[in-house]
């Protein structure tokens, strides 16, 4: 077996529920060596509690956890599930996400992958403070919408994807204008990804004997009620799990090197003059194969 991939997760967990699914998927994946989780974008104390509670449920309080910069309106969709969790009880809580990213990367003997599944404030802050981190790390990024190929009509073509649109300046400072090697997972592959009811029910059943999956499902059910989602159907879109999958394997995904530039409307364009070269996932070979993998991985079958 290959040595596990050293990983940092930079996440806006606690808003859409897919970040929680992505964190659970990481924690269930022996191919990944999670060393740090950083929170970004919204209500940072609440979001950091969400991450801490899931890490604790998995028995992984060895993973360092660092709050980043917020500023946008709070999206506390699973606050009922978080309850009165005491963040000060988390044993590896650090002070600052940007500093934690820098320290983790610069003190590593191996190149680290930073999986970015939220806005890019922490990356921008870390890179501006220490550009040298790009030499010992690479980025895997959920963001953009290139051809709108997998969105099934629910996301308009030539429109800005949220992780870029929520802070275009952070995207430019943290991604486009950096020396980082970038692997991009746009909506073309991460959009329209959801587990149909039989798969979801299998994950729900696994939670009866697995503390992490039990807490994931419990938080998901709170999110459903808060967001008035169809409670007894499939999952909501699980965009960020595609980023985790790409960190594990490139099998089943088709990539192409493209110069990507986000214009002032946050639309991702293929632009040879202004774009940054990125390895972009554009299509699936078999999306059903991914669904089977995700379900089996969360259920502890593989």
Where are these regions (language model features)?
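N-terminal acidic, glycine/proline-rich low-complexity segments
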Residues: 1-302
């Amino acid at each position: 077996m290959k040595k596990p991939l050293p990983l940092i997760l930079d996440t806006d967990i606690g808003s859409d529920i897919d970040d929680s699914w992505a964190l659970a998927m990481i924690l269930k994946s022996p191919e990944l060596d999670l060393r740090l989780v950083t929170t970004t974008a919204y209500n940072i104390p609440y979001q950091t509690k969400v991450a801490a509670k899931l890490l604790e449920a998995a028995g992984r309080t060895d993973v360092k956890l660092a709050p980043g910069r917020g500023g946008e309106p709070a999206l506390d969709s699973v606050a009922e599930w978080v309850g009165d969790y005491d963040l000060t009880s988390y044993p590896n809580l650090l002070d600052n996400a940007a500093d934690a990213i820098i320290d983790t990367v610069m003190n590593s003997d191996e190149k680290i992958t930073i999986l970015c599944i939220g806005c890019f404030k922490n990356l921008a802050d870390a890179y501006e403070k220490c550009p040298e981190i790009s030499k010992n790390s690479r980025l895997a990024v959920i963001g953009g919408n290139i051809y709108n190929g997998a969105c099934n009509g629910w996301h308009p073509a030539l429109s800005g994807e949220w992780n870029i649109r929520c802070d275009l300046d952070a995207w430019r400072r943290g991604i486009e204008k950096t020396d980082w090697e970038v692997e991009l997972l746009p909506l073309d592959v991460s959009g329209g990804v959801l587990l149909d009811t039989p798969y979801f029910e299998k994950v729900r059943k696994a939670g009866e004997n697995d503390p992490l999956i039990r807490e994931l499902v419990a938080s998901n059910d709170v999110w459903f009620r808060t967001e008035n989602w169809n409670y007894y159907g499939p999952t909501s879109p699980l965009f960020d799990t595609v980023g985790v999958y790409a960190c594990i394997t490139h099998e089943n995904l088709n990539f192409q090197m493209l110069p990507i530039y986000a214009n002032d409307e946050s639309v991702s364009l293929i632009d040879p003059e202004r774009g940054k070269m990125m390895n972009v996932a554009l299509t699936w070979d078999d999306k059903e194969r991914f669904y089977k993998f995700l379900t089996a991985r969360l259920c502890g079958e593989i």
